Every structure is written in C-alpha cells, then in structure tokens.
C-alpha cells in the first residue's frame, strides 16, 4: 500500500494553517516537503509524516510557543520518537520549561510527574500523538466522503 501525498493546499487545509505558513516553514527548513519540484509550475507534495509534523508545529504554535521554541520542540520530538507518524501510535509526551537551562524539556508523559510539575506551578504542554492522528484522520475522512459524493474540493 502506497503512502498518501498531499499538495500544499491539501496539507494547509488538513492542518489548519495558511499556505504562507507552509512556505515560511519550508524556507526555514522546519518541515521540508518530501517531493519538491523545480522550475516554473513546480509541484510540492507532503507525505503523511510531513503532515503529522505540520500538525505538531501548528499545535505548538497554537499553545503560545514562539516559532523558535516550536521548531526546536518539533525537532526534538521527531528525534525522540521514530514512530511519531505511525497512525497507531498512542504515545504521549509533555514539554515543560527548565528554568535553569531556560529551555523546553521533552519527556514521555508520566501522570504523576505531570501532576507534580503542575503542583509546583510549572506549565506543561501535552502532546498526545493519538489526538493529532485522529484530527488528521477526521479531516481525511471528510475529504474522501466529499470526493466520493462528487463534490469538487478545489
């Protein structure tokens, strides 16, 4: 079974970001599309794993992280979890601030540790990969149903 690919427009719709954001993230090499054409009329396609990265980046920005923090966080998560794009992944992570290092720390979610951090007044950012995959699947299912019904999506 082949991997699904998304045009820039489809990826932006799926993730809930603008085409300009995708272009900026591409220019900054935060999320680089799998297939990039060259020349006039070039086509850019994002793989399923690229779209998962886009969704994670969008989420990190939506919770108030700066672009630099979100970019570092995404990179750290992708390096820490080689199965982040697996649609069956149920892994849970949290980011929290390390005051001494003045940076975000990524850890696998542990309920007791998360509660202890909250009890200390520490903010945490949960990353539930399962929820991200569900969001992407819901959008994909809607698109498929509309296409099957003969609705032109472009």
What is the role of each PLM region?
Residues 1-2, 58-154:
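Basic Lys/Arg-rich amphipathic helical interaction modules
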Residues 1-53, 59-65:
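Basic helix-turn-helix/winged-helix DNA-binding cores
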């Amino acid at each position: 079974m082949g991997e699904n690919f998304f045009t820039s427009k489809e990826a932006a719709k799926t993730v809930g970001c603008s085409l300009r954001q995708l272009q900026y993230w591409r220019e900054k090499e935060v999320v680089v599309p799998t297939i990039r054409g060259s020349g006039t009329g070039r086509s850019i396609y994002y793989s399923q794993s690229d779209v998962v990265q886009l969704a994670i980046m969008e989420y990190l920005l939506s919770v108030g992280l700066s672009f630099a923090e979100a970019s570092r966080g995404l990179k750290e998560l992708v390096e820490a979890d080689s199965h982040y794009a697996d649609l069956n992944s149920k892994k849970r992570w949290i980011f929290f601030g390390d005051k001494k290092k003045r940076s975000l720390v990524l850890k696998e979610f542990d309920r007791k540790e998360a509660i202890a951090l909250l009890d200390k007044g520490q903010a945490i950012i949960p990353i539930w990969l399962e929820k991200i995959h569900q969001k992407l699947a819901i959008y994909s299912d809607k698109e498929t149903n509309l296409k099957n019904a003969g609705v032109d999506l472009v």
